[in-house]
Amino acid sequence: MQYAKISGTGSYLPANRVSNDDLAQKVDTSDEWITARTGIKFRHIAAENEKTSDLAAEAARRALDAAGLNGNEIDLIIVATATPDMQFPSTATIVQQKLGITNGCPAFDVQAVCAGFMYALTTANAYIKSGMAKNALVIGAETFSRIVDWNDRTTCVLFGDGAGAVVLSASDTPGIIHSKLKADGNYLKLLNVPGQIACGKVSGSPYISMDGPGVFKFAVKMLSKIADDVIEEAGYTAAQIDWIVPHQANRRIIESTAKHLGLSMDKVVLTVQDHGNTSAASIPLALDTGIRSGQIKRGQNLLLEGIGGGFAWGAVLLQY
């Protein structure tokens, strides 16, 4: 049986780091308030000339280097993003060009907001298991700073920019063991950006609209449920999970999932304090951090999970 195994990871955060104290100079908030409710201390903001594709390409270069591959050995590129460079073409094709990949491999975007990397990773896994790809470049990249209302203290404190990337390679030994994706459009009003461009006009707000308490309750419930489902369907138990690598949105949501599974926070890769909610980038950012720090080791079992507007959510159980 052929598996899709992680052969390299990479991540990138823009140089401009904004602290809670910095934000307190602009809106009515404080370091204590933000930290107590979210666990966030800093977020990184892309430079004016940095696009989502720039962040994605830099994370991809680092992942390719870690995998020991050159760009033209990649035969699939998937970018998960809710903040693309353009209406079209896909950010994935722009990244392909920036990486100098000329082999004509398929490249496309997926959009499931904060669950985007789960959707992209699951899609790449299917390509590899079917024999349609041998080396897939899977990227989560966002510039959420451009869809945040910096006068709205309830949302501007939460989000940041960044990118994370994974190279998935065909392997005879286990990599991705099981994954599950879910969505329910009945909850779209809890979290969205309602604005749109049509007929040469912008209609609706271009900024994030969020029902914070509603999002919190839904996320806690669904992340616990899908974690249970993926572990059980794979024939595993929670005790066999070495690391949870969750979407980095809110420390309290992450703590709730760990508690539900009966796992200590010592088994959670936690990076939300350093970069805030980077949407589709947050899981691969945390994964790369865990691997490069030496926390995550080869052969260990990882549970990746995320949830985002839509609502869309997903989880992946894999052996690193």
UniProtKB/Swiss-Prot annotation:
Taxon lineage: Bacteria, Pseudomonadati, Pseudomonadota, Betaproteobacteria, Neisseriales
NCBIfam families, sorted: fabH (TIGR00747), PRK09352.1 (NF006829)
Pathways involved: Lipid metabolism; fatty acid biosynthesis
EC number: 2.3.1.180
Name used for this protein in its record: Beta-ketoacyl-[acyl-carrier-protein] synthase III
Organism: Neisseria meningitidis serogroup A / serotype 4A (strain DSM 15465 / Z2491)
Single GO MF annotation: 3-oxoacyl-[acyl-carrier-protein] synthase activity
A Gene Ontology cellular-component term: cytoplasm
Protein family: Belongs to the thiolase-like superfamily. FabH family.
